[in-house]
Amino acid sequence: MVMSKILKIRNVGDYSQWVGHTDTHPLVSVIDYAEVSPVRHCLNNYSVYGIFFHDEANIDLAYGCGKYDYKEGTVICVAPGQIGGKEDNGELVKLTGWALLFHPDLLQGTALEKHIREYSFFDYRVNEALHMTDEEHDILVSLMRQIKDELQKKHDALQDAILVGYIELMLNFCQRFYNRQFITRKLVNSDMLMKFDQLLRDYYEEKIQLTSGMPTVQYCAAKLCMSANYFGDLIKKMTGDTASNYIRQNLIQRVKNELASGANISQVAYELGFEYPQHLNRMFKKFCGYTPTDYLKLIQKKPGC
């Protein structure tokens, strides 16, 4: 049996050495997999950013604690501190497609350094990867080629700024393509929203709130087999509101239903997992503009917020 090991990708050169690619820049590497020889599988622990896509492949990849079947036209983005790849089984694989790796040091002092983690797809699970259309594939390949061409030029005072500009452009395109994916998967996403609602119903029916309090975005995302970032982005696209607000609004409606059925405020606060009635009062007023007591006075005249 082949022993499993994790390769530490401390810099772009470590990855390039693994696949047999020669770099021309210490902080950036673009690899056309068609130009490298077959390699053995390996789990990689990244200290660099990476954007990977394959033209065609059937590879069962690991990412964090999850697995993913790497399909044609799929983009995966990794950030420092993440693990990806496949355990070495002794077989050689011919990778296809492209890879862009860049070290965080390249971004020092740039605007991108400050907001790169705003691209939440770096924290998506691999089974939430971007599936490109043919047009999107061509755009990203074109950018890969432009970065590769720039890397082959003689280094000058502007090269790093140009490279960062290309990288930011690629990230913005990835964000646009993810937005498209959220929209085109509307039917699937609609089913997910129904599952989200059912999850919240089950949470309260099973009295989990009595020991764990209000459900969190992290809890719901995990139950629905998503990363918190992808789940939050998806709910935002579907409802126009954050996942945390969606959970709170669901809770507010439960409070109203309980009050309308004759329960007192302290009883409702306890049943819904609030440590003190004041906590319920504060959240209710924030969302409705008035307190539960005010709601009880208005309930016969004007239901709802």
Give residue spans per PLM region:
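An amphipathic alpha-helical interaction segment
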Residues: 138-201
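Generic protein-terminus/edge-of-domain signal
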Residues: 1-69
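…primarily DNA-binding HTH/wHTH and HhH modules…
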Residues: 281-305
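Terminal helix-turn-helix DNA-binding modules in bacterial transcription factors
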Residues: 237-275, 297-305
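Short hydrophobic/aromatic patch on the recognition helix
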Residues: 73, 231, 279-280, 284
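A short, Lys/Arg-enriched amphipathic alpha-helix from helix-turn-helix/homeodomain DNA-binding modules
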Residues: 164, 186-224, 245-263
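A hydrophobic/aromatic-rich effector-binding and dimerization subdomain
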Residues: 89-153
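Short acidic-glycine-tyrosine-enriched beta hairpin
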Residues: 65-79
